[in-house]
Every structure is written in C-alpha cells, then in structure tokens.
Amino acid sequence: MRILQLYIGGQRVDLFKDESVSLTQTIQNVKDIAKVFTEFTQTFSVPASSVNNKIFKHYYNSNIQGGFDARTKKAAYLELNNTPFKEGKIKLNRVGLKNNVAHTYHITFFGNVVDLKDVLGDDLLSSLATLNEYSQVYDFTNVTNYIQGYAPNTNDNVLVPLITHTDRMIYNGDSNAHEYGNVAVHGGGGNNNGINWYQFKYALRLQAIITAIEEKYTIANGYATDIVFSNDFFNDATNQEFDDLFMWLHRKKGDVESTSFGEATWTTYEGAATTQTFGDYGGMPTLSSFQNGQLTISKSVGDDFTTNSPKVTLTLNPVLTSPLVPYDVRVTGSNGYVLLENTIGGLQTIINGVEPFENGTYSIEIRSDVLLQFAAGGIKWIVEYEFRDEDFITLSGGIRYLNQATFSTSAVREFNITEQIPKMKIIDFLSGLFKLFNLTAYVDNLGVLVVRTLDSYYAANTKAPIVIDEYIDVTKSDVEIALPFKEINFAYKGLGTLLAKQYEQIFNSGWGSTSYTLNNQTYDAPTEDYKVIAPFEHMQFERLYDLDTSASNIGNTTIQYGFFVDDNFESYYGDPLIFYPILNNGTAMKIIDTEVASDVATLTRYFIPSNTLALQCGTSETSIHFQNEISEYLARETGNPNCFIDSIFETKYKTYIQDVFSNRRRLVKVSAILPLKIYYDLELNNLIEINQETYKINSLTTDLTTGKTEFELLNTLIW
C-alpha cells in the first residue's frame, strides 16, 4: 500500500481518500525537442477540512485580514510512505464551494525547475547589478587597450572586438590611399585614414552573466530560493566552447549613448590665451599678464594707477548643449583668494568687475558630471584699469585674455554594462543557451540546478538497465512510430546583418542554419517541420584583404572584423550577438579619432570576432554554426576552409535526432506497477529493459497513490 503525503510550509495537508495524484516526468520529449526546463507540474484537489482551512487560512473568506496570499507559490514537498519524494512549490488556484460552504481547494504542485521561471520572472539582463563591476571608461585609450587585450585591471571578462556599429573597414596598402575606413598603416596620411575608436563597443563573457545570475538570486537577497548552477557545463573554465563565448554590448544601433560618467573632478585650465586690448591700453604701463592659464595682477606701490584699479571680470561660455549642463567653478589666488560658484550651465559671469582685484596669481578650475567643452574664446578674463600720466590726464583701457584652444572638463565617460547590455530577459537568455547547446536541467538533492548537455546526461548513467518484465501489464501495450516531424530546422533568430543577408540571398539558406532529415529524405509525419531557434544574432564576419593591386602587396591580412549594419548599409539593432573573440597578431592597423588629431594608435594585435573557437581547425574544430560552414578566415587560403566539422548540430543534436528519424526507432508504451525501491531510485537517464531489449525513457506518468506508471520508451539504437 502506498501513502502519499503533501506538506506545505512544513504542515501536512489532508488529501481525499479517492484522489488520484499523478506526476509526469521527462527530461527531453521526442515530441517537443526544444522545450527546456521540463520538470513536472500537476494539478489536484484537497478537501476543505479543518486542517486545510487552517493552512489556507479560510481563503474563501475575503474579510480575513492577513490571510493566505495566493499570488505567490509556497514551498512544498511530497512523501511516499513517509519517505521524501519530490520538492517543489504549490499554487492555490481556486476554492470550490457547495451550498456556500468551502468544499475543495484546487492546487498545482510545481517541480523546482519550473520554479526557476517564477524566480526570474520578466527580469532583464540589465537588472544584474553586479555586472557593473565590469564597467569601463569609454575613451580612446581604454578602447584601444582592450582591443589589444591590454586590460588595465587584468580583467579577462571584458574586451573590445573588431566589430563596427556603422562604418566599414577596408585595407589598402597603397601609400596614396588616404581615406577614412582604410585601416592600413602607411606614411603621409595623418588622420585621413584609419577607423574611429568609437566605432567599437565592449563585449562581456557569457560566464560572467551566469555568475551574476547566481549572485543576484539568493535567499539572502529576498528571493524564494538560491539559484546555483552546477559546474557540468556552466562554471567550468575547461569547457571552452561555452566559457570562451562573449556577448557584444550593443543596446542600441549606432554610437554608444550613456548617461553614466565617472565622479566629477576639478579640471584646471592651463592653456594659452589670445589677447585683445581696448581703450588707452597702449599708453599705459601693464599690470597684468597671463601664462599657462593663470592670470597675474602686479600693481606696484607708487604706480599712478587709480585706487579702484584693476577691475576684473571673468565670464564662461561653454559649448551650447540641450539641456544645459550644470558646472562648478573655483577661482583661487596665491594671495588666499577663493571663489566657488555653482552654476546651472550656459553663459555665466563668475566675477563681475565691481571690486578692485588684489595682486596675485589666479587660476580657474571647472568640474561637471558630464563632459563639457569651452571652445576658443569661451573662457574670458577682462582686466580694466585707469592710469594718470605725467600730465595728470586719466587714461582708461584694458586687456582681454581668451582661451586659445578648446578646453574640456575631465568628466570620464563610463561604459556602464547594465546600460549597454542588450535588452533581453534572463529566462530567454538561459532558454537560448539551452536550445543552442541542447542542454537539460534538473535539481539535485542539494538544490543545485544541474545543467548538462543531453548526450552527457545520458552518458552519466552508470547503472545497469532496470529490468521491469515482472512488473508490466502484459494485457496491453502499444508500439508507435516515433517520427514526430517531417524535418527539424535549426537556426539563429538574428540573421539580419549585411553579409548574413547576402548569404541567404545567394544560397537560399540561413547563415549557420541547417535542416535535418535522415539522409535528406522526406518522410510522412503527423506534424509539419519543427524549429529550434536560438534567440541570438549570428554574423558572417569578414577577413580583410589588401586592395593594393601591386604584386608585392596582394594577400591576406590577419584582420577579421564584423560589420554590424543591415543590407541598406545602415546601423542595425539586431538580436544579442554572441561570438568567440580570438587574439590575433600580425598586420598593423590604424585606429584614430577624427576629432582629436593626436589620438592615433597603430595596433599589431587585436581581438577578432569568430564563429569558430580557433582560427585553425588543427587547434579546434568547434564552431557555433548549426551546420558546417566555410571559415571566413580561411576562405581564400589553400587547404580546406570547411574543416570546422564540430558544429552545434553535429556535437549536440545528431545522436538524439538521427535516432528520431531512424526507420528502426519505435515509441513503446507500457504500464507497470513498480516497487517503491525501484521507483525511488529511478532516474530519467536510466535504461529500462523489457524482454532483453533496452529503452530510453521518453516520459513516465505515475499515479502516486496506486503506483501505476505509464511509460513512453524509445528503443536504443546502435549506429
């Protein structure tokens, strides 16, 4: 006899004596291959007994204060004959009444993997606050350092790949080919050739996102459970096919837009000045000078200047912005003079020229939270004074000192990770990885979410096949065709960048996509095509070749880049892009800032984006294509550019899928009443033996009160 017990919040629930409670369990169902997080759910009813009314706090009575909150699931577990069986959550759906009296509570029991969706909800990747530990300064120096792998903080979770958001790169070694976008390094071009540094954006290691999920979703942070992933696929630095994957931090098309800047610091104006004199200045001795941004007043005792001389005015007029950028000004003098002014932005008179100025050297400091620029003439000192000459004639005039070059505050522009990471739900990110790598998940006895590839999950079974001949109901069984689909299509959702679109137009197939039927045959099946779609962008990258037609220069470069535009050559939004960054050495390339002539960098090492784990298949044959595609990097080299044969389909899906389409595959349905000792230890990767034939478990549905189990089994095949 089997006794089922349900506990909610540690309290045992009364059950109907004749209630049939069954659970369906499956890891991967042949009928729905792309479905992930497949732990069971089961709805059943319990009586409105005094015990249950206490547990559910008479939910039918809405007048009760502090009653049962049915908006959230509650911790629960099942026991069979006082032995723990399954942990999960319950949700109260409704209360059934008879003659206006509570009679039945209708509840649903959820397995722990299903609960993952409830914990994550609709949270976006941008909600993972700890990712901001990887935020970086966004400027010429930092970007060029991170392109070369010179991370100042030795952080290898962030880098900058050669992916441009708008502008095309070419390579033309002709010394006369001075044009923007040509990254070849040769003399005489200055900043006329090269690519702007702000065409590039940072990228983040996918494992860092997994870690951030674990750090956020904890009981200590107020969540219902700790999300902890095993180290079977995630959290394993030796698993290069995942650990080396990065996501391009591209939140919007085109330039980086950020509201985040580093802490505002004072910036001292130290530039030279243009002078303008007025009035009788030429007939008077000087009492002021200007050097390295500092104004010096030097009026000697006995000089025939009037007592109210000099009068000094300071005006600041930054480059117009909308809205205005507030800024602070601090004027300090060697004589102890200090003036601090907080402004709302725009044109401001800081010193009004009313009181005479004392001797001393005065300097200006300005700070703002956002980068602020003062064009030439935007910082202006006016020194005005009167002088009596030897004929006692009063002369008046003065001099203006205007900044000669543009001055900028030193607010540091920050590339904030949570502001720049693509807009994507965390659950969609995880589901996408599960679909891409054919992963499966279950919760172990320690509450760890074990994540493995399906093949490794089945391979982990070390038990001998479980023989159930003596327990099955021989009066009825079915053997069905196991072919659920005509064909299965594997593709990335995002195939909208220029070269990927061109590939589709030429070959009538998606870049990196594949369709599978055994031996490319078309079969009759009860349903149409089945689609496995990974919700990421998949680019075709471009290796640069020297456009110089002179014989000595024709050939490959070591530069490969991504041109993230659509087929109209316009900036493209797309889906979250994942790729392998490979640090390559060789051909020199130039990165510039067309607005700052001194910002020029020559790079001979750089992170190039790739769809393969390595550039040479002798190192690794792994790719993130669903099918074997030609290597963009090896396309024009001698040898076989199709040598990256370890595609996603080949290594993650083929073993399972080719069995599905085999003429020898059968779906066998049998019933059995298993002893508890077998049922307790039964795992979904165990093999079942019937009549000396072995089977994989497709699904099993068990009536927990009677012990009757309905098996769907797939016969094992040897290829």
Regions found by a protein language model. Give the residues of each.
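Terminal (often C-terminal
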Residues: 257-322, 329, 333-334, 376, ...
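Noncatalytic modules at the cell exterior or secretory-pathway interfaces
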Residues: 353-373
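Short, well-ordered loop/turn sites that connect or cap secondary structure elements
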Residues: 70, 357, 681-682
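Short beta-strand-centered aromatic/proline hotspots
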Residues: 86-95, 693-703
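Exposed aromatic-hydrophobic patches
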Residues: 298, 346-355
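Polar, S/T/G-rich
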Residues: 1-277, 379-413, 418-436, 456-464, ...
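Solvent-exposed serine/threonine-rich low-complexity stretches and specific carbohydrate-binding patches
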Residues: 335-348
